[in-house]
Curated annotation (Swiss-Prot):
This is Aliphatic sulfonates import ATP-binding protein SsuB 1. It is a peripheral membrane protein. It is found in: Cell inner membrane. SUPFAM superfamilies: P-loop containing nucleoside triphosphate hydrolases. The keyword Translocase applies. Residues 63-282 form the ABC transporter domain. The gene is ssuB1.
Amino acid sequence: MNATTSAAAYGPLAGADLEAELAQARVADSDARDAAILEHDGSASVVPLARRRTSGTAPDDAVTLSGVSKRFGARTVLDNVELGIARGSFVAIVGRSGCGKSTLLRLVAGLEQPSSGALVTRGEGGGALDTRIMYQDARLLPWKTVLQNVMLGLGRGARDQARAVLDEVGLLERANDWPAQLSGGQRQRVALARALVHRPQLLLLDEPLGALDALTRIEMHALIERLWREHRFTALLVTHDVQEAVALGDRILLIEQGRVALDQAVPLDRPRARASAAFAALEDRVLKRVLAGGPGAADHDAEHEADKVRPVGQIRWAV
């Protein structure tokens, strides 16, 4: 199979210059059962570190890291990371500030190169893995309309395709508006549309909702989940918000001291019931594990730490 490595050229990264009710008794029984499973020590939902692949590449993996380390001068940010990301999966990465989450994302995006180890990406059919990235800042060009921002890098023949994607994110009626006329949540919807118009195989999300209010975040969660389920791209989300990780991911990775310290499956039905006992139990389990690392457990990322915007009063944020 033809594989591309992190040294191979990626396509342009959009955003870089740039979402039958069960009977109540059945719901309660299911929630209680799932919560009990999650609370049980040695739950099968937790993937033991020893079971993670240490060499080779599974044929269904879109991304594989084998012994990957990243150093900035004398500082080691990622240390011998072994990781496989299955094609079509939604993986959320959590951890304290500076643990290496964003560095890992930038390596996968090809914006940084590993100091050692191998990072392999595989597109469908063995070709290049078309990758797009979405940041906390929507990075829209203020002198271009919403539609023109979505069409960046595309020819005029893509107008209908861009309008269709704007319709998918609920902003078709704002196609001719300027970015300054939009709310923060609407601007992020445009950024999402700009990434999805290319129909990427891999979508990287670097804390894209961190600056939004709580209600808008929940609406964006529903939108992102719906589009992921429809298009089945591989998604890799970096977030400080453990609740967000449980809401969106089918797998949660905790980065601690430059390594994958926890690899947790999310055995919850979609769409996620945030008020369920199982959801709360899993959120609590992951949050406690994040906090157990201690405030001095991680070195700082060497890039864009000053760009982080962290809402105040989010009790489920691990910062």
